[in-house]
């Protein structure tokens, strides 16, 4: 087990999809084993408003936080409001926007990451990941001894630049990259192609160009190649990685949840009834009518990938 573990995701204190659930629901177990040597790192996207998932604590690592600020990196440090309450570092990566060309240039020179076609939905996560790598490097230099085992775990292409940064600048930090679904695989499935039966026939680089995701696919592919360990969550995605990213995964780590992830008994019944009532009220407001009998509710959540969720028509 490592002495220090960082877990980096765009979904730390920022619920987008299932990765938020994966990390949040294991935090209790990890903090029981590692205490405050387990730190989660996410983007600071709600600076002007209250983030209900984050509780700032100005007493945590005050001097170090101020030293980061002097280096041009703004962070907030506190606790993630989930079971286990791990230390959370939220990074304001906007200070790196003026350096974006240099960051992207270095990714090309060091790893041949092709960022030319990347738009802001690519650039912002890359800057966040890069800043996360800088923060982890600084932490290791200030709080860890040369004998400590330090591991930084990066989820999805949105954070991959962090691991690539550490590989060049902090060789004492072991890097782990997990993909929960490949960029090319999402495109193949979302466009009605036979992902699993024809997987061995696809050229992922060509597909990325066709669907205009070259930059995202490129950094994901290089992350798979150059992190110390490459993980995914199932046999199916492991096969995707083999054919679309060109590297077999080091390990498969199935998603796991705490036993109390779903409410039990009366608490479950009460919360379900309240949620159903709220959904019906919203639907009635949208339609401008009252439903005469109990309606059937079909809902989707997480990423806006309707076809991948089995919906051929969305209105």
Give the ranges of each region predicted by the language model.
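Catalytic cores of nucleotide-sugar-dependent glycosyltransferases that transfer UDP/GDP/TDP-activated
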Residues: 1-315
